[in-house]
Structures are given as structure tokens and as C-alpha cells.
Amino acid sequence: APANSVWS
């Protein structure tokens, strides 16, 4: 899994 995730 990625270390960060972006939510908009």
C-alpha cells in the first residue's frame, strides 16, 4: 500500500 493517499 502507498504511504500516502489523496482524497478530494
From Swiss-Prot:
| Biological role | May act as a neurotoxin.
Keyword Transferase recorded: no
UniProt subcellular location: Secreted
Keyword annotations? D-amino acid, Hydroxylation, Neurotoxin, Secreted, Toxin
Task: Please list every transmembrane segment annotated in the UniProt record, as residue ranges.
Answer: none
Q: Which residues carry this modification: D-4-hydroxyvaline?
A: 6
Free-text description of this protein's post-translational modifications in UniProt: Occurs in 2 forms which differ in the post-translational modification of Val-6. In the form conophan gld-V, Val-6 is D-valine. In the form gamma-hydroxyconophan gld-V*, Val-6 is D-4-hydroxyvaline. Both diastereomeric forms of D-hydroxyvaline may be produced.
Name the chain's protein.
Conophan gld-V
Task: List the GO molecular function terms.
Answer: toxin activity
Q: Supply any other comment.
A: The mature peptide does not contain cysteine residue.
Q: Which residues carry this modification: D-valine?
A: 6
Organism equals Conus gladiator
UniProt family annotation: Belongs to the conophan family.
Superkingdom, natural source: Eukaryota
Modified positions (4-hydroxyproline) are 2
Q: Name one GO cellular component term.
A: extracellular region
The record's tissue-specificity note reads: Expressed by the venom duct.
Q: Does the keyword Transcription regulation apply?
A: no
